[in-house]
Regions:
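Conserved loop->alpha-helix
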Residues: 1-206
């Protein structure tokens, strides 16, 4: 489980396709603290560390590798990553820590596309559009005003939701410390809807 509070960027240093899977090798400041089998969220996707590498000619810093399977690649924006891209990362929560964001499972539901950006006296409003699918909405894939949503792994508060769009306000600190700084109109992002809404939607069907 995660909280949606991004620790830092990881930078993609290598991408290797292995049949239907893709191995991503990345570097960050705390590679030395990682271990094999550890769960780390990448743009909101929970992935398992499968290898840790010492500095080499390919990457002068320590690095680590995670593997994304086909279902993950089909559902998320990870398949769009290129070498040099920045990825939001967060290690799984400690059970004795504060939940500063909201409950994030690391199970991305679908992608959305940025359709508008608006300056708001120092902050920035991003508008995202996702698939208008009534069946998915019945499963809890929707947003509510002042509710929580996870965008590229970042826990955010929803503004001005419609049936398939919503806005989020990004303060300068979040812009500086996440890959929201790279989002433009047309950029594809990962969405995880609030698990509480999904459970309520499911209960209504029983």
């Amino acid at each position: 489980m995660f909280s949606g509070i991004i620790e830092e960027f990881a930078t993609v240093v290598a991408i290797k396709k292995d049949r239907d899977n893709i191995d991503f090798t990345l570097t960050c400041s705390f590679v030395d603290e990682l271990s094999i089998d550890q769960s780390v969220a990448h743009n909101g996707v929970c992935l398992t560390v499968v290898a840790i590498h010492q500095p080499s000619d390919i990457c002068p810093q320590p690095s680590y590798t995670v593997t994304a399977m086909k279902e993950t690649l089909d559902r998320t924006n990870l398949g769009l990553l290129k070498v040099g891209d920045k990825v939001n990362i967060e290690r799984s929560m400690l059970m004795n820590g504060r939940l500063d964001g909201h409950i994030v499972q690391g199970h991305v539901d679908e992608t959305a596309r940025c359709i508008a950006m608006e300056d708001a006296n120092g902050s920035t409003y991003f508008t995202f559009e996702y698939k208008d699918d009534r069946e998915m909405a019945r499963k809890g894939y929707f947003t509510v005003d002042k509710g929580s949503v996870t965008v590229n792994g970042v826990s955010l508060t929803v503004c001005n939701p419609t049936k398939n769009t919503f806005q989020v306000a990004i303060i300068p600190y979040t812009m500086e410390h996440t890959n929201f700084q790279d989002i433009r109109v047309g950029t594809v992002v990962n969405l995880e809807f609030d698990i509480l809404g999904k459970y309520i939607a499911r209960l209504q069907q029983l």
